[in-house]
Amino acid sequence: MEKKIVFITGASSGIGEGCARKFAMNGYRLILNGRNVEKLAAVKRELETEYHEDVCLLPFDVRDRRAAAAARESLPEAWNAIDILINNAGLVIGVDKEHEGSLDEWDVVIDTNVKSLLAMTRLVVPGMVERGRGHVINMGSIAGDYAYPGGSVYCATKAAVKALSDGLRI
């Protein structure tokens, strides 16, 4: 039986790295994405050494749709049938009140937390539909249900992640 392939965005640290470790521990092949090539390479070395699983790196900024599409297209044939997509890349910057916040910072948060999730889903899910199987895990946050002072934009993006996840199931 062929090992399943998991594609994880934001895999160079934190929750994404933790997911990579858990899936490697359980015998999955991994496609890891992140912006920091050195950190990704270190994660790859650790996982291959500790768990002896195949790891493919796709370093790019998920906000860059062209880079995402080019990375997806660059995958060797043996890595094309992605079974699980984990949209984990995300960030929070700025904790200003809405009437004081930076539109540029908000663009970065929205582009990373919402639009990149849509773009990655659009790049990967058609193959899942074609094969009749696959799973998408979108990392949300309790902040999507409960706003906190200065966090309204981040909280709104996490509420959007929840709504998009619900919509994807339909």
Where are these regions (language model features)?
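Conserved glycine-rich cofactor-binding loop
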Residues: 12-14
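Conserved glycine-rich Rossmann-like NAD(P)H-binding loop of the short-chain dehydrogenase/reductase
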Residues: 28-42
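The beta1-alpha1 cofactor-binding region of Rossmann-like NAD(H)/NADP(H)-dependent oxidoreductases
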Residues: 37-38, 59-70, 103
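Substrate-binding pocket helix/loop in short-chain dehydrogenase/reductase
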Residues: 96-98, 102-110
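Active-site loop immediately N-terminal to the catalytic Tyr-X3-Lys motif
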Residues: 99, 148-152
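Active-site helix of classical SDR
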Residues: 121, 157
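Residue(s) in the substrate-gating loop at a strand-loop-helix junction
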Residues: 141
